[in-house]
Amino acid sequence: MRVLLVEPNYKNKYPPMGLMKISTYHKILGDEVRFVKGFDNSVDDEVWDRIYITTLFTFDFDLDIETINHYKFLVNDINDLYIGGIMASLMPENIVKVAGIERSHILTGLFTDTSVVGDDNDINVDELP
């Protein structure tokens, strides 16, 4: 499986912990994983089996929605696009309304059960390094 991890173009020093744990999870499964920040045109001509996009602060809502709308067309099936992070946990219904993503594809809280992304294993992603 080809997995793309996306962080909107925030001004920060460290990569998002949640996406890094998801990276570890997919590498354990033997998947190809790529991380990008902001709008990375180098991945625009590729089709991805699964895309995860993180969100951070609520004041970055517009940037997050722009990022979601940019990358949602690069996933093989829109049902394999997942949005998570702090803002997604606080404002899931706003993302549903504005970006047209199904509520079940907005990951809120901890990522302890991989069945929420359609996987069937006992790995607790939040416990991974």
Predicted regions and their residues:
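A short, structured N-terminal alpha-helical element that caps or precedes a catalytic domain
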Residues: M1-N94, V98-E102
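N-terminal [4Fe-4S]-dependent radical SAM core
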Residues: M1, P92-P129
